[in-house]
Swiss-Prot record:
PANTHER family: NAD KINASE
Source organism: Wolinella succinogenes (strain ATCC 29543 / DSM 1740 / CCUG 13145 / JCM 31913 / LMG 7466 / NCTC 11488 / FDC 602W)
Name of the protein: NAD kinase
Enzyme nomenclature, EC number: 2.7.1.23
GO molecular function: ATP binding; metal ion binding; NAD binding; NAD+ kinase activity
Lineage, uppermost ranks: Bacteria, Pseudomonadati, Campylobacterota, Epsilonproteobacteria, Campylobacterales
Positions of transmembrane segments: none
Enzymatic class: transferase
Subcellular location, record wording: Cytoplasm
Catalytic activity: NAD(+) + ATP = ADP + NADP(+) + H(+)
SUPFAM superfamilies registered for this protein in UniProt: NAD kinase/diacylglycerol kinase-like
Amino acid sequence: MILMQPLSSLSKVGVILRPSSPSLKEFFLQVRSLFEREGIEVMLDSISGGMIGIYGCDFQRLCSESDMLVSIGGDGTLISVVRRSYPYGKPILGINMGRLGFLTDVRQDEVEAFVQKLKAGEYRIDSRLMLEGELSSPKGTQRFFAFNEAIVTRRPISGMIHVKASIGEEPFNTYFGDGLIVATPTGSTAYNISAGGPVVYPYSKNMILTPICAHSLTQRPLVLPSEFEVELEMLEGEFANIVVDGQEIMDFGYGDRLRLKVAERPALLVHKKEHNYFQVLREKFSWGDA
């Protein structure tokens, strides 16, 4: 789903910088000046502020008071901001300072012109499906949200793992191998594609299940509609890990259960009006090159 309507007003933005990058101070000052020139107030989160020696506010206040969040870094920074700010439902603009820039499509040299377009309402807001996870174990229940994927994976020096998968209350498969990826359409071009999973249009409402190095030639990726809930259970073998968007890790042991479903609300990403997903695929993956 694509939301073509911009915000009714844009008076304040909250900025989050890529961690461990104090060299971003000069660029942040430039970005702040560009927004302020358009009459838009700029807030900075406290962790970013401490990194570059400028006052910042706590993340909760930043999200609550801002009309839009601005992530300055790479795709990893944007994903972190999406996950942390998800309860607040704010649209997020990604300025690309990284290598890939699959999600952060505004380059450094485009910022000045794009800030003017933001003020004029000449942009679009895309909605991206999120996953909601619930891990039940003897330690209790942990809930989380995933933007790209949740992965059940063996530990670095352990053997293969055995995972039972059910759709709703119906068991449908067991996976024996290095792990299993449950990805969103947005995450289909991340770890999922490296493991042989399909590319799924990011505005589709699906979940993708892709085995990692399965010990069977018949184990293949599966695309499910969004109304299904997937339950994963460890059957035997050593402890495994659950890795969420490459940024959060949890233990997953014998008898533990992981439930995954499509979250009630999507994440909101700010893009140029002319943003074209298939053009991004061609450029980032070098598709069509002779």
